[in-house]
Amino acid sequence: MFTGKTFIALALSALLPAASALAAGDDTLVYCSEASPESFNPQIASSGPSFVASSQVLYNRLINFDPVKNTPVPSLATEWNVSPDGKTWTFTLRKGVQFNSNKFFKPTRDFNADDVLFSVLRQKDANHPYHNVSHGQYEYFHDVGLDKLIKEVKKIDDYHVQFVLNEPNAAFLADWGMDFASILSAEYADAMLKKGTPEYIDTWPVGTGPYALQQYKVDSLIRYVANPHYWDGEVPTKHLIFSITPNVETRLAKLQTNECQIIPAPSPVQFPVIKGNKDLALHSVEALNVGYLAFNTEKKPFDNLLVRQALNYATDKQAIVKAVFLESGSVAKSPIPANMLGYKKDLPDYDYDPQKAKDLLKQAGLEKGAEVTLWSMPVQRPYNPNSRRIAEMIQNDWSKVGIKAKIVTYEWGEYLAGMRKGEHDSALFGWMSDNGDPDNFAGTLLSCDNIKTGSNVARWCDKPYDSLVKRAILVSDPQERAKLYAQAQEIFYQQAPWITLATGKTFYATRSNVSGYSVSLMGSDFSKVKLN
């Protein structure tokens, strides 16, 4: 995480125009970001805005994802192969890839296998000299199980690395396209360690990506300059500015006045305004996500299955989607998105039935009701474009069956930290796919192991469910995996650790003269943007 000292150092690092001077020319693009980054190292970050500001601008990974097919394609690795037993993966690395430089460091060599080993071992090895730098928790690395899965990572030569696994894993390749798998410079890390400033690799990042960090003013702006040696072709827009704008209405106002040229996650109620302005354009992409309310199953009354089932029946999901999502979403019934491998189409759902909810609550001994807290997210997401409104509608639904829900919210970082610790009774949350694999939902969000890491917000541990998802990740055959996930979803439905609410399309808006910007599993790609 950043410190006050770090913020000051970054803010005073460059004699550049003031934050208000964001006029864009043909070589400057302004993006209205939703929030300040937690860190410029995606290995130790966990929020979407942090990943957009770091991994998707400053770094690359071994693989990328095809934006249409969502399948792995080469990036820093040009090819790969796996042994017949599925336990040994060998990657061939791209030659001629240069790292950026900054005022503390100028690289003397190109990207090679040493950088891959450093980026992996920092996260895996508790005795690595960088493991505890910046208080790194490496949440994603642990959530996908790489700390236990990887037995050994070896440098064969400068342009070949080999991973030896403890067991086969169907999602292993896709994991190396995730944000946390960004490749950092081992040479830079060594230099900063010798100078006694190891934290600089996280606050003054050096990567192989399309842009380099130039300036950061906390809660105000981030300035980047194009990488003149970018391996994937010339970057058309030389200057990129993130204008940090948490308020969704302010973001639209800035887009209308050309103070920024791209905004993420406009509210559905803003769609008519955007569509009605010839200078603006509204864009959408199909997304792999799910929004949900998680019951803390370790706390009363949600440790009682009857209560969880009752409140599923008490919640009018159709009304929520109609009122809040408008054209941007559809009702969800599974933890796995509908357009993903393993989704069970015939999975039943809880229909809106307040009387059935009352009957179940009576069986649970709560005929007189109960009081609980309902945490509401402070940010907008495709799977939850207006958390406060959704929370209020759920609060109203529950009140009809005798459950009084007190809505609370916190700053985003505090919200995430509190959920990881299990401080909530119930909480609105959601997930967007990191790698296109069903384990990223069924395992990451609901496995017993991930109660400890914090991504299992329901803190639900069901041994039969857990066994099924652990078996599924070992299987390479898609049909066999789908059967296992179908069985797991049946248990999920019966045990009701969540109220699955909705899946939402990813929307963003631009000035009409913007071209080349894309959004995919990898997030935002600024490397081809042009201002026409």
Language model regions located:
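Detector for C-terminal structural segments
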Residues: D26-L29, A53, A170, K217, ...
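N-terminal lobe/hinge region of extracytoplasmic solute-binding protein
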Residues: C32-P84, L121, H128, V206-T208
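A structural "hinge/loop" feature
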Residues: A35-V52, L76-A77, K103-P107, F172-S182, ...
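Aromatic- and charge-enriched surface segment that lines or borders ligand/interaction sites
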Residues: T78-P129, Q162, K254, P301
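Surface-exposed binding/hinge segments that line
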Residues: T92, K124-D125, P129-A189
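Ligand-site clamp/hinge motif
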Residues: E199-D202, N227-V273, S284, A391
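Structural transition elements
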Residues: Y211, V331-A364, R381-R389
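A bilobed periplasmic-binding-protein/Venus flytrap-type ligand-binding module shared by bacterial periplasmic
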Residues: V225-P228, V285-A310, A314
